């Protein structure tokens, strides 16, 4: 690839703002550290936003969708037609993420990167159509080099649109029947971990289905000879359009200075790809939750992430990240609106 924009420097954190936020935390009317992880979140957001008292009024959510050729191997409980049907549900307002976006007063963008329905035309959806889904990675690389680069760029473009619209937080979500298989395959490469330890039920496989899924992945990894040292090759061979777009969006946000809240298993795989491609972007990633897919815990550990929630979620769509937004907003409100000891005339140390 010649256009390696993903290697460009990310926006620097504002260390002065973080120092000021830390000093403010020490003066608020509470024992130091008593708000636990919320205190660190407020300080981190101060550094990301470049101000002592961060706010999260403007949240942008983008759903990236794409179908997966590996579904031909019988690794999903649902037919591929569901991907296109869910696009209609997203823009129609009936999906979980649609409801959450309304409740959060967040913008919601839906990007079709390539479903099996080439005739699909939905108002409110960006149809980019990089292909009729990826190729079956059990037999050949999932994406061509041009498709991979276009998917990364599509994610970056979404991040730049969010930045131009004043977003203070970006959430990427995904939709694609078969994408937990692609994500588990990528995770297996990047973590150097057997697929059987990372594969889960996805949309509802039984135990035999999960075993078959892991066997398909292991066979594909032997075919392609992938290594963690070449994340782009791994992404192109066993990834998905939407996973590549998520990785591009995460790097694009970090370069544009927009904080990212990462959703579940699939989004965390994309985050690990992004960090492999540009380690500087890690500072811009917050992690919403630990989901039910068995590989998610290992991914979070590799990313040194402290998720905010653990609710047994495995829906995707960015839903877990959306559920964590109120926590981030409350962390900012506590940090910005609590009185200091001096303001409240409260003693700042025990008697």
Swiss-Prot record:
GO terms under biological process: cobalamin biosynthetic process
Reactions it catalyzes: 5,6-dimethylbenzimidazole + nicotinate beta-D-ribonucleotide = alpha-ribazole 5'-phosphate + nicotinate + H(+)
E.C. number(s) listed in UniProt: 2.4.2.21
GO MF entries: nicotinate-nucleotide-dimethylbenzimidazole phosphoribosyltransferase activity
Domain of life where this protein originates: Bacteria
Record's keyword annotation contains Transferase: yes
Pathway(s) served: Nucleoside biosynthesis; alpha-ribazole biosynthesis; alpha-ribazole from 5,6-dimethylbenzimidazole: step 1/2
Pfam families registered for this protein in UniProt: DBI_PRT
EC class (word): transferase
Keyword terms of this UniProt record: Cobalamin biosynthesis, Glycosyltransferase, Transferase
InterPro entries: Nict_dMeBzImd_PRibTrfase, Nict_dMeBzImd_PRibTrfase_bact, Nict_dMeBzImd_PRibTrfase_N, Nict_dMeBzImd_PRibTrfase_sf
Active-site positions on this chain: 317
PANTHER family: NICOTINATE-NUCLEOTIDE--DIMETHYLBENZIMIDAZOLE PHOSPHORIBOSYLTRANSFERASE
Record function comment: Catalyzes the synthesis of alpha-ribazole-5'-phosphate from nicotinate mononucleotide (NAMN) and 5,6-dimethylbenzimidazole (DMB).
Family to which the UniProt record says this protein belongs: Belongs to the CobT family.
Name of the featured protein: Nicotinate-nucleotide--dimethylbenzimidazole phosphoribosyltransferase
Source species taxonomy: Bacteria, Pseudomonadati, Pseudomonadota, Gammaproteobacteria, Pseudomonadales
Gene coding for it: cobT
């Amino acid at each position: 690839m010649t256009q390696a924009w993903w290697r460009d420097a990310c926006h620097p954190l504002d260390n002065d703002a973080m120092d000021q936020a830390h000093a403010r935390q020490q003066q608020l009317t509470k024992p130091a550290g008593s708000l636990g992880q919320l205190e660190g979140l407020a300080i981190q957001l101060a550094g990301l936003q470049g101000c002592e008292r961060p706010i999260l009024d403007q949240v942008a959510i983008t759903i990236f969708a794409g179908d997966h050729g590996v579904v031909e191997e019988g690794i999903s409980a649902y037919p591929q037609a569901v991907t296109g049907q869910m696009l209609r549900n997203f823009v129609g307002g009936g999906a979980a993420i649609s409801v959450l976006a309304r409740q959060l007063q967040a913008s919601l963008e839906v990007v079709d990167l390539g479903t099996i329905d080439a005739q699909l035309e939905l108002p409110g959806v960006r149809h980019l159509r990089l292909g009729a889904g990826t190729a079956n990675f059990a037999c050949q690389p999932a994406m061509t080099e041009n498709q991979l680069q276009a998917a990364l760029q599509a994610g970056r473009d979404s991040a730049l649109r969010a930045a131009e619209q004043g977003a203070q937080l970006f959430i990427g979500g995904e939709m694609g029947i078969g994408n937990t298989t692609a994500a588990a395959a990528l995770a297996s490469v990047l973590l150097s971990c057997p697929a059987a330890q990372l594969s889960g039920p996805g949309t509802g496989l039984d135990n035999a289905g999960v075993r078959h899924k892991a066997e398909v992945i292991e066979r594909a990894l032997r075919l392609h000879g992938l290594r963690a040292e070449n994340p782009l090759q791994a992404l192109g061979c066993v990834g998905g359009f939407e996973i590549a777009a998520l990785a591009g969006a995460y790097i694009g946000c970090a370069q544009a200075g927009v904080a990212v809240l990462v959703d579940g298993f699939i989004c965390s795989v994309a985050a690990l790809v992004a960090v492999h491609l540009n380690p500087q972007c890690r500072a811009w990633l917050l992690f919403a939750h630990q989901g039910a897919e068995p590989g998610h815990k290992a991914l979070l550990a590799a990313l040194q992430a402290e998720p905010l929630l653990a609710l047994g979620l495995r829906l995707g769509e960015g839903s877990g990240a959306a559920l964590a937004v109120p926590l981030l907003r409350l962390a900012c409100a506590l940090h910005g609106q609590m009185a200091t000891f001096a303001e409240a005339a409260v003693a700042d140390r025990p008697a």
